[in-house]
């Protein structure tokens, strides 16, 4: 490889954000270089061996709809699949896959190595080359200068990474990997707003020392779900169960008696940890009334004896970890193979980014993943695909793109970050989206694949598959509208109908009944409806049964769209807007929202303040 050549895009970091960023840029046809400190760890699952979950599964489906890698890799590595919230409405149902770490890395590496326009090189990056307010390349650990027209940083927890086990601490990007100290210093020298965050991981346990008879077995779903719209159950490896156990009062006593040895409670750790994935120390303190906490006992893979005890993340001293682990049901003789630890790292205030994940200070420098204050593989991958795509679009001199809040959870994620920032690791939940009924897992392709095709992200295989699916849905919906269910059909459904039909109705109206599904319609031979795959019939049922609610949300979106279309000039000085409070002026001048709608999502910006902004725009004869 000629390392003196100019790359269009250099992606720094080969985790979940970096792999999606590199693949996205390369799919758009630009010459892309992925730099990683260790090629063998591309796509490494640094913490829990799982993909998806509430809110997170939605992100994975959206990445897949844009032809990303995560869902396909999860299908090839998933050793247990479940649909969470299966008994609830379609808006909050979410897919989760327990994954084999080794198989997942293998699947990601295979996709990277088979991608045209993408080169992989093993080198850590120590510095950025900045000239004339733009990044022109990177300097690697061994002194190589690699030139680029755009750079995407996806450096995870490696920036200034510090690992804590009890009162002992040492520099590290994660256990066994060095931190990026030089790059952290270089970025701090750019005067970007920086902070510290914390995350943690539990000790790993040898499964041969666990008594599973004391635990509740948790099998996967049957039939086995798939993640990718192009996936099939036949893609999955062997399926295995997980287990559930609980802490005991003895566990809690040991932890309480050793809180003075916890770096978090001793004040040694300055970074804020994830609210929704607290350490076991945090749980014991915050929920002091609880006598036990649930632990999910998850296999790390098919070819390893290591178990991931989800729910006991800790940074207590190793000897204390051994003590409290052995008070947990089934863990009485547990052998810890790796200690739990906490890690602190640098992140940069995401309010310093545009919605395209480019830094406002250096417009051809993009950030994605934990560097922006998020936590989770799925959140990182979602940012990665947007950052990599926009880096490529910028080079091609094409319009950059990010989905709106009403188009995708990816849009919710990015808008939350750039508008509100974050003081703790940000995790996606369905509750963060205003339009949950529109942003379901099942329709991510209908929402995003056509746009992905227009942008150049979506390849022929996915486009052909999607086009056939969409055509089947549309043609069947038309058939349902033009077909009639007659009163005499009551006889077919004596045991099913809550209330018999009083008059003939269109099949589309009949399907809206909660007790009726598409399979019932197939029983009426005179309708001549086609047999269809489950993912298509599910889509047809949801679109019809929730039509009223969906229409109402669409109307709300249209009302708010005028605010999204009311753009705020970047040069607008909010000190000139008569009537705004000093707090609002300060926030608007710092964040520089791009639209009236984004301004309204900033904490403290009231509807009255938005009205004053509108008046100012009209008086100044700025476009409204």
From Swiss-Prot:
InterPro entries: FAD/NAD-bd_sf (IPR036188), GIDA_C_N (IPR049312), MnmG (IPR004416), MnmG-rel (IPR002218), MnmG-rel_CS (IPR020595), MnmG_C (IPR026904), MnmG_C_subdom (IPR047001), MnmG_C_subdom_sf (IPR044920). It is found in: Cytoplasm. Coiled coil: none annotated. FAD binds at residues 13-18, 125, 180, 370. The keyword tRNA processing applies. The keyword Protease does not apply. One of its GO terms (molecular function) is flavin adenine dinucleotide binding. Belongs to the MnmG family. This is tRNA uridine 5-carboxymethylaminomethyl modification enzyme MnmG. It comes from Legionella pneumophila subsp. pneumophila (strain Philadelphia 1 / ATCC 33152 / DSM 7513). The gene is mnmG.
